[in-house]
């Protein structure tokens, strides 16, 4: 609290914090029967920070557009961390019943969505458009530091391990999990190569490779290095210390 209070008092507008709220312990803040994002929001706002919450991805936008009475928004506002984790861990049918099913009118908003569609409703921290918008707002905020509170899913993209508490214990993904990960993110690796976990190399003329090279140059090269400059100091004239030498017999 002392550190964030200092940043707020000094109006450190170039300071941006990002808190990954993945709702599981060990490496993510969580309040099973409460809401860590709102808790952090209070702390930072009270210390003079600009707070940006990136909670719901853009796949929710069409559903929110139907929410003329604010009923879906009300459900979103009151859901606690433990429930949010379950909605990802237990699939679309569970989410339809336990989340949308709390209100008949809200349930009707997703009548045209399959259970798979509901499962794919994304969190804001995994939506590049929402993340970009948050960073854009953060870097253009003047007069105060900014914190981005991003809701994410533990084990995102790992298939059956996604949002599962046992994700913490997983050291290696199975071949099926790797295939699921590859297919989900459209990674150009065929089945024969998958077990070797090859590095992905972009073509030298691709926009991705050009971006990486340009960024490396801006950062000063591929490997960080500490540069030391030796400065030779001129020895003072011994006459300056004459009285000290004579007082100690030389």
Language-model-derived ranges and their functions:
Residues 2-18:
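A short alpha/beta connector and helix-capping loop motif
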Residues 16-18, 22-250:
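Conserved acidic/glycine
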């Amino acid at each position: 609290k002392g550190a964030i209070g200092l940043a707020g008092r000094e109006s450190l507008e170039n300071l941006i914090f990002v808190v990954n709220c993945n709702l599981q312990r060990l490496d993510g803040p969580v309040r099973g029967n409460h809401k860590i994002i709102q808790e952090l929001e209070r702390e930072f706002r009270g210390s003079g920070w600009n707070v940006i919450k990136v909670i719901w991805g853009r796949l929710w936008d069409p559903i929110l557009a139907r929410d003329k009475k604010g009923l879906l928004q009300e459900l979103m506002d009151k859901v606690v961390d433990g429930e949010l984790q379950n909605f990802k861990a237990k699939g679309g049918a569970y989410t339809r019943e336990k989340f949308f099913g709390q209100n008949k009118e809200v349930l009707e908003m997703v009548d045209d969505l399959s259970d798979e569609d509901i499962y794919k409703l994304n969190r804001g921290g995994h939506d590049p458009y929402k993340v970009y918008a948050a960073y854009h707002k953060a870097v253009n905020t003047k007069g105060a530091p900014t914190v981005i509170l991003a809701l994410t899913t533990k084990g995102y993209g790992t298939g059956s391990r996604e949002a599962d508490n046992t994700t913490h214990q997983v050291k290696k993904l199975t071949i099926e999990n790797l295939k699921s990960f590859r297919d989900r993110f459209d990674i150009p690796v065929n089945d024969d190569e998958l077990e070797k976990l090859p590095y992905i190399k972009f073509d030298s003329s691709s926009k991705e490779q050009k971006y990486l090279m340009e960024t490396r140059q801006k950062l000063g090269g591929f490997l960080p290095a500490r540069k030391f400059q030796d400065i030779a100091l001129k020895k003072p004239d011994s006459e300056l210390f004459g009285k000290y030498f004579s007082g100690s017999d030389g």
